[in-house]
Amino acid sequence: GPDYDDVGAMAVMHALADSGYVDILATISSNKSELTIPCIEIINTYFKRPDISLGVAKGESAVTLECPHNKKWTEVLPQKYTHRIAKSSDAPDAVKVYRSILCTQPDNSVTICTIGAFSNLKELLQSKGDEFSPETGVELVRRKVKQLVSMAGVFPEGREYNIYCDASSSSFVVSHWPTDIIFCGFEIGYNIITGRRVSRMPVENHPIKDVFLLCMSQGEPQGRWSWDQATVWVAIKGYTPYYISERGVISVDSEGNNTWRTTR
């Protein structure tokens, strides 16, 4: 959160899991808002996965973001639907969750998908050996992670929120991440609008419909851009046949501007 394309992204993730395309290991928030984890738990529970591991950013550089609408979906969902975790700060530390899960997975098997800030991943890379693994964060990621897929950046150059909201973490991650990163830039999801069919579904007590209906009624009747949904799709299904990709090197400066240099 707080953009409601996050809700759409979770719906895509769960739908693809229902179809057998992905095993969801955890849902981890880079947003320290106290409402984030209750909302994530509600969506996981609706899709019959109430026991998915949850984690939240605890680092000093992590952002706290709230929904910009007058009537906030992040307040409406926890009021309407039951949840076990009262507030985000009650959830486990994101880095601990990452490390505890990664150490149990086969080598080169995990895809990490980010649709927010890079704060948690910086903390993961900088982590030391612990009760879960003697390896450093970089060593653990290098051994266990297949790829990182991120909704971040504008290509070939620009300034995009998920990068500049914590520019120092973004710069660190893109410079030190030890596996391939696939970037789904702002320009991808900007050309995809979703929400109208979701908001008209003939169902009641459906948190995805509730969120889209509420937010679309506050100034976006056509629906919402789908930055995060597109990224989750690529993370799980790959970028073909809908997109093409090129290899290159990304750079992020202290103000959160990104540039791209194509390589062969």
Name each region found by the language model.
Residues G1-R264:
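N-terminal acidic, glycine/proline-rich low-complexity segments
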